[in-house]
Amino acid sequence: MNHSETITIECTINGMPFQLHAVPGTPLSELLREQGLLSVKQGCCVGECGACTVLVDGTAIDSCLYLAAWAEGKEIRTLEGEAKGGKLSHVQQAYAKSGAVQCGFCTPGLIMATTAMLAKPREKPLTITEIRRGLAGNLCRCTGYQMIVNTVLDCEKTK
């Protein structure tokens, strides 16, 4: 296949319809960054760090491993889509208030993973073990994770 050939991808990103063009094999993270969605970080590019976490149909995924072509017909949410009317989401507010993260590189991925975790219906509150498991794909070099876990617990109480 000639690399100059492109595919057309129709999807919704942060509530807005998009018709995008990409070379087959392009990761979703790259395509999103080309649209100016710079919260989608390119860290490890092998699905180990979680800096590229976005929601696809409500599920947190590593967008560096997710082909752009697979986004056809999907609803994609990035950190840029979480604030509504200039107001941060309750998860964004909680992370900002708690100071759970330091340098900020991991913050978008953690917020998106937290958002997905909190959106899942359940009968009981999340346990610390469930939170740690839910954030296991998101690396943070600056913290010991306890403040992040506490932030998720606070988010659940205030949602």
From Swiss-Prot:
Keywords: 2Fe-2S, Iron, Iron-sulfur, Metal-binding, Purine metabolism, Purine salvage. Residues 7-82 form the 2Fe-2S ferredoxin-type domain. [2Fe-2S] cluster binds at residues 44, 49, 52. The keyword Disulfide bond does not apply. The keyword DNA damage does not apply. Pathway: Purine metabolism; hypoxanthine degradation; urate from hypoxanthine: step 1/2. Binds 2 [2Fe-2S] clusters. InterPro entries: 2Fe-2S-bd, 2Fe-2S-bd_dom_sf, 2Fe-2S_ferredoxin-like_sf, 2Fe-2S_ferredoxin-type, Beta-grasp_dom_sf, Diverse_Oxidoreductases. GO terms for biological process: hypoxanthine catabolic process; purine ribonucleoside salvage. GO terms for molecular function: 2 iron, 2 sulfur cluster binding; metal ion binding; oxidoreductase activity. Its cofactor is [2Fe-2S] cluster. Heterotrimer of XdhA, XdhB and XdhC. Iron-sulfur subunit of the xanthine dehydrogenase complex. This is Xanthine dehydrogenase iron-sulfur-binding subunit. The lineage of its organism: Bacteria, Pseudomonadati, Pseudomonadota, Gammaproteobacteria, Enterobacterales. The gene is xdhC.
